[in-house]
C-alpha cells in the first residue's frame, strides 16, 4: 500500500490509464475480428471497409502509445494479406 500522497495519486492515475488503454485495445481487437468475419463469409467490399476501419483504430492506438508501431504494422499487414488473398481468390 502506498504511503506518500504522490504514490497514492499515482495509483489512481495508473488505474485510470489502465482502464482507458484496455478500452482502446478491446476496440482494436474487435475491429480486427470484424475483418476476419467478413473474410469468412467472403464479402470483399465489406472486408475492404472493415479493413480501413481497423487501420484507423490501429493508428489511433499507436498515436496514443498503447500499441508499438511495429506491432500495429505487423497486425495491419497480416489482415491486409488475408483480404488480398480473398480478393485474388474470387
From Swiss-Prot:
Protein name: Small ribosomal subunit protein bS20
NCBIfam families: S20
Pfam families per UniProt: Ribosomal_S20p
Single GO cellular component term: small ribosomal subunit
Family: Belongs to the bacterial ribosomal protein bS20 family.
PANTHER family: 30S RIBOSOMAL PROTEIN S20, SMALL RIBOSOMAL SUBUNIT PROTEIN BS20C
Role: Binds directly to 16S ribosomal RNA.
InterPro entries noted in UniProt: Ribosomal_bS20, Ribosomal_bS20_sf
Keyword terms: Ribonucleoprotein, Ribosomal protein, RNA-binding, rRNA-binding
Species this chain originates from: Fusobacterium nucleatum subsp. nucleatum (strain ATCC 25586 / DSM 15643 / BCRC 10681 / CIP 101130 / JCM 8532 / KCTC 2640 / LMG 13131 / VPI 4355)
SUPFAM superfamilies reported in the protein's UniProt record: Ribosomal protein S20 (SSF46992)
GO molecular function: small ribosomal subunit rRNA binding; structural constituent of ribosome
HAMAP family: Ribosomal_bS20 (MF_00500)
Example GO biological process: translation
Amino acid at each position: 500500500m502506498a504511503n506518500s500522497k504522490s504514490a497514492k495519486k499515482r495509483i489512481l492515475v495508473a488505474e485510470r490509464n489502465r482502464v482507458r488503454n484496455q478500452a482502446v485495445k478491446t476496440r482494436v481487437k474487435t475491429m480486427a475480428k470484424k475483418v476476419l468475419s467478413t473474410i469468412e463469409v467472403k464479402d470483399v467490399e465489406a472486408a475492404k471497409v472493415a479493413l480501413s476501419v481497423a487501420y484507423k483504430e490501429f493508428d489511433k492506438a499507436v498515436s496514443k502509445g498503447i500499441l508499438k508501431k511495429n506491432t500495429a504494422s505487423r497486425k495491419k499487414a497480416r489482415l491486409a494479406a488475408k483480404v488480398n488473398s480473398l480478393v485474388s481468390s474470387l
